[in-house]
C-alpha cells in the first residue's frame, strides 16, 4: 500500500465521503481513513435526507457533482416536497431512505474512484512541519504523508454516550470514539468546545399497531434529488404519524431528574431545532401532545425510527413512555435512545475555504465545525475536499459566498459568527432566497464546478443540453404574444390597455400556469415538462429577481473590498470597540465585517473609504 497521498480524509460519514470524492474528482491522489469500510455512508441518526433548507444543500452538492443526491435517490423509499403549497424558494425536497441501500450506494460510489484508496484504522494524531500539515499517524503506529488533510470526525471526537445515569466513551452506539486527534488540536492551540446531540429509541415495526396511527404517503411521482436520476425505481412506502399524550408527559415529568441533561451530567449544548422529548415537555408543557413520525428504516428491516422522541432517559423510562403513545402501547424497543457529547473546533478558526488559520493544508468539515445534520456535513465536506485537492496541487482555493448558494451562507455564518449551539440550515438564514432555490441549484453552481474541474463528463453533457433547452424555451415563450382582447377569448382577464403580452409575461401572473399558455400556443407543447417548470418559475419571480440581482451586485462590491492585511490601528475614525472587534475576528472583506456583531454602518463606511484611499495611493506610486 502507498504511504503518501495528495489528500487524506479522516472519517467516512457524510462529510468525509463528499470530501474524499471531491478531491478525487479533481485528480488528487486521495485516501479515506475510517475505522471500518462497512460503516462508510452510515446514517447515524434519522433515516432521511433533505428537508427545509437542507434539501437546498443536497441539490447544491449534486450541482457540483457530489454524491449525496444520487445516493439518496438510489436508497430513497419515500420522497416528499415539503412546503409544496408555498413559493418555490422555500420548498424543500426530502426523502426517507433505506439505511442499507443508502450505505451500499455510497460505498459503491466511493469504490468507483480509481485514485481514491480506503485505509481502515483510527487516526490518532496529526503530523505537521513549519506551519503546514504533513500527514497523520494511526493508532497502530502507521504513518501516511499528505499535502492536505481533511478532518470529518462527526460525533467521534472524544465522544461520550449518555443513557440515564450511565455514560461511556463512544463515537456512535457500539463504536469506539476518536481520542487522539483532540490532543493534536490542543497542541496546535485550537479552541475546542463540547456539543451534544441525541437520538430516539428504535422500535420493532412488527409490534406497532399501524391501524391506530395516521398514515402518510409520499409524492407520486417521486421527484429525485439529482438531475442525473431519470426516475425513482426503488419501491416506495408510507410513514405513520402519532402523538404523545398527557400520560406521556406525566411519565417524563416524574423522571426528568434522571435525564443526563437535567441531572447535570451533560453540560454541553444540544441542537435548538431538534430538542429531546424531555426538553419539549419542560419547555412546552402546556401542549396536549407532540407529533411523532414513525419512519421505517428499510424495505426488509422491521426497525422504525420514531422521529420526535429523542431521549437519553433510562431504558425502563423509555419503555414506559412508549406504552402511553397511541399505536406504540405494545411495541418492542429494539434499542434505547441516547445522547452523545463530542468535541468541536470553534469555526472562527477557519478561513471561508474551510482551511484552518493555524495550520496550512488542514481542512475541517461537518460536526467538528459545530453543525448538525447530514446535509450540512455533506456540503462542507465537498467544499473542504475540493479546496484540499486544490491546495495539494498548488492551485488557488475557492470561496462560495452568500450569493452563490446555501453552502456559502452556512460557511460564512460559521466562520464569521461562530456558534453557541449546533448549527442547522434554514431558508430564513439566506438573504437571497429568491435566487437560491432548490430547483435552480445546477443553474447557479454547475458552471462554477466545471471551471474548477470537479464536474464529470456525464453531468457536463447533461448540463449543456439542459441550459440550451431552457434558453430556447424562454426565447420561444418571449416571442409569442397576445393582446388583452385575444387573451379574454381564452378566459384570461388582463388589463385592457392594448399592450401585447408575451407568453413569458403571462406566466408572471400568479394565477396563470403553463398549461393555460400552452393551450393558447400549441407550439409550447414541444417544451419538455421539466424545462417548462423552470420557465414558469423564472417568469413568476422575474420582477423580484431583477431587484435581488441589484442587491447581489451591491453585496459583491463589498465582498471585493479585501481586509486581509489591514492595520486597523492605522484607520482613522474607527471607534475603539470597532477596532477591537475587527482585530479579534480579522474579517476577510468589508462585507464579512458588516456581518460581525457591533460593526456599525458608519464603521463600514470608514473602512471602505480607507481602502479606496489606499488603492489610489498604490496606483499613484505604481
Swiss-Prot record:
Assembly with partners or alone: Homodimer. Heterotetramer of two MnmE and two MnmG subunits.
Binding site for NAD(+): 270-284
Domain of life according to the entry: Bacteria
Originating gene: mnmG
Record's keyword terms, sorted: Cytoplasm, FAD, Flavoprotein, NAD, tRNA processing
Signal sequence coordinates: none
GO CC term, one of those recorded: cytosol
Residues reported to bind FAD: 11-16
Pfam families listed in its UniProt record: GIDA (PF01134), GIDA_C_1st (PF21680), SAM_GIDA_C (PF13932)
Single Gene Ontology MF annotation: flavin adenine dinucleotide binding
Protein name (Swiss-Prot/TrEMBL): tRNA uridine 5-carboxymethylaminomethyl modification enzyme MnmG
Function: NAD-binding protein involved in the addition of a carboxymethylaminomethyl (cmnm) group at the wobble position (U34) of certain tRNAs, forming tRNA-cmnm(5)s(2)U34.
Subcellular location: Cytoplasm
Disulfide bonds: none
SUPFAM superfamilies named among the record's database cross-references: FAD/NAD(P)-binding domain
Amino acid at each position: 500500500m502507498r504511504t503518501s497521498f495528495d489528500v487524506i480524509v479522516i472519517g467516512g460519514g457524510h462529510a468525509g465521503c463528499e470530501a474524499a470524492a471531491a478531491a478525487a474528482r479533481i485528480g488528487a491522489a486521495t485516501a479515506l481513513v475510517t475505522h471500518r469500510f462497512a460503516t462508510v455512508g452510515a446514517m447515524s441518526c434519522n433515516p432521511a435526507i433533505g428537508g427545509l433548507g437542507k434539501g437546498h444543500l443536497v441539490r447544491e452538492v449534486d450541482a457540483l457533482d457530489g454524491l449525496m443526491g444520487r445516493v439518496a435517490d438510489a436508497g430513497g423509499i419515500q420522497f416528499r416536497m415539503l412546503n409544496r403549497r408555498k413559493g418555490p424558494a422555500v420548498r424543500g425536497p426530502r426523502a426517507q431512505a433505506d439505511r442499507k441501500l443508502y450505505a451500499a450506494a455510497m460505498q459503491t460510489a466511493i469504490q468507483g474512484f480509481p485514485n481514491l484508496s480506503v485505509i481502515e484504522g483510527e487516526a490518532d494524531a496529526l503530523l505537521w512541519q513549519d506551519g503546514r500539515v504533513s500527514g497523520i499517524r494511526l493508532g497502530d503506529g502507521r504513518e501516511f504523508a499528505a499535502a492536505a488533510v481533511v478532518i470529518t470526525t462527526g460525533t467521534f471526537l472524544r465522544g461520550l454516550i449518555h443513557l440515564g445515569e450511565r455514560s461511556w466513551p463512544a463515537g456512535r452506539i457500539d463504536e469506539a470514539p476518536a481520542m487522539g486527534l483532540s490532543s493534536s488540536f490542543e497542541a496546535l492551540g485550537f479552541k475546542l468546545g463540547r456539543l451534544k446531540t441525541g437520538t430516539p429509541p428504535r422500535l420493532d415495526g412488527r409490534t406497532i399497531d399501524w391501524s391506530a396511527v395516521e398514515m402518510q404517503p409520499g409524492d407520486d411521482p417521486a421527484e429525485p434529488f439529482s438531475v442525473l436520476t431519470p426516475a425513482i425505481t426503488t419501491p416506495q412506502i408510507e410513514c405513520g404519524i402519532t402523538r404523545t399524550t398527557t400520560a406521556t408527559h406525566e411519565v417524563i415529568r416524574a423522571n426528568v431528574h434522571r435525564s443526563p441533561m437535567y441531572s447535570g451530567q451533560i453540560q454541553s449544548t444540544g441542537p435548538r431545532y431538534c430538542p429531546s422529548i424531555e426538553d419539549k415537555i419542560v419547555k412546552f408543557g402546556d401542549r396536549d401532545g407532540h407529533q411523532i413520525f414513525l419512519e421505517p428504516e428499510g424495505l426488509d428491516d422491521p426497525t422504525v425510527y420514531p422521529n420526535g422522541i429523542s431521549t437519553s432517559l433510562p431504558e425502563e423510562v423509555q419503555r414506559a413512555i412508549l406504552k402511553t403513545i397511541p399505536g406504540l402501547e405494545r411495541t418492542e424497543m429494539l434499542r434505547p435512545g441516547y445522547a452523545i457529547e463530542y468535541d468541536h473546533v470553534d469555526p472562527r478558526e477557519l478561513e471561508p475555504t474551510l482551511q484552518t488559520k493555524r495550520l496550512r493544508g488542514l481542512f475541517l468539515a461537518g460536526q467538528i465545525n459545530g453543525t448538525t445534520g447530514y446535509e450540512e456535513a455533506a456540503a462542507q465536506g465537498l467544499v473542504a475536499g475540493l479546496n484540499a485537492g486544490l491546495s495539494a496541487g498548488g492551485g488557488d482555493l475557492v470561496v462560495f459566498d452568500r450569493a452563490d448558494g446555501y453552502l456559502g451562507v452556512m460557511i460564512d455564518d460559521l466562520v464569521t459568527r461562530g456558534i453557541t449551539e449546533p448549527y442547522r440550515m434554514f431558508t430564513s438564514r439566506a438573504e437571497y432566497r429568491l435566487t437560491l432555490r432548490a430547483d435552480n441549484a445546477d443553474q447557479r453552481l454547475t458552471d462554477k464546478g466545471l471551471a474548477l474541474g470537479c464536474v464529470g463528463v456525464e453531468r457536463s453533457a447533461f448540463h449543456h443540453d439542459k441550459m440550451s433547452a431552457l434558453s430556447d424555451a424562454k426565447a420561444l415563450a418571449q416571442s409569442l404574444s397576445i393582446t388583452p382582447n385575444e387573451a379574454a377569448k381564452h378566459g384570461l382577464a388582463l388589463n385592457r390597455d392594448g399592450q401585447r403580452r408575451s407568453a413569458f409575461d403571462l406566466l408572471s401572473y400568479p394565477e396563470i400556469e403553463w398549461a393555460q399558455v400552452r393551450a393558447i400556443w400549441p407550439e409550447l407543447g414541444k417544451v419538455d415538462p421539466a424545462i417548462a417548470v423552470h420557465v414558469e418559475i423564472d417568469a413568476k419571480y422575474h420582477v423580484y429577481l431583477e431587484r435581488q440581482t441589484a442587491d447581489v451586485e451591491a453585496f459583491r462590491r463589498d465582498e471585493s473590498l479585501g481586509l486581509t492585511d489591514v492595520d486597523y490601528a492605522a484607520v482613522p475614525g474607527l471607534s475603539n470597540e470597532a477596532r477591537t472587534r475587527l482585530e479579534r475576528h480579522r474579517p476577510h472583506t468589508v462585507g464579512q465585517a458588516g456581518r460581525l456583531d457591533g460593526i456599525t454602518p458608519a464603521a463600514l463606511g470608514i473602512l471602505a473609504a480607507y481602502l479606496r484611499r489606499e488603492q489610489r495611493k498604490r496606483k499613484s506610486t505604481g
